[in-house]
Swiss-Prot record:
Record-given protein name: Progonadoliberin-3
Family assignment from sequence similarity: Belongs to the GnRH family.
PANTHER family: GONADOLIBERIN, PROGONADOLIBERIN-2
Signal peptide residues on this chain, from the entry's feature table: 1-23
Keywords, in A-Z order: Amidation, Cleavage on pair of basic residues, Hormone, Pyrrolidone carboxylic acid, Secreted, Signal
Glycine amide modification, residue list: 33
One GO term describing the cellular component: extracellular space
One annotated GO molecular function: gonadotropin hormone-releasing hormone activity
């Protein structure tokens, strides 16, 4: 009886060690050193390149609209830039 319990404990210990050594030691999608895989980076760049616009639902609350509203909007009119004023020596 003592030999079988010892073997059982050893098998459980071996299973635990194997499980810990084969498990992933970093977050899913991240490589060691905090680097992302190239496939996920490519997908992120594609998503940004499409100019994806987040549309608000019809029943969006005022709090949600305030949170999604851009704070600094740059106008297309660039006439307010005057190089002579910014760089007087050129």
């Amino acid at each position: 009886m003592e030999a079988s319990s010892r073997v059982t404990v050893q098998v459980l210990l071996l299973a635990l060690v194997v499980q810990v050594t084969l498990s992933q030691h970093w977050s899913y999608g991240w490589l060691p050193g905090g680097k992302r895989s190239v496939g996920e980076l490519e997908a992120t760049i594609r998503m940004m390149g499409t100019g994806g616009v987040v549309s608000l639902p019809e029943e969006a609350s005022a709090q949600t609209q305030e949170r999604l509203r851009p704070y600094n909007v740059i106008k297309d009119d660039s006439s307010h830039f005057d190089r002579k004023k910014r760089f007087p020596n050129k």
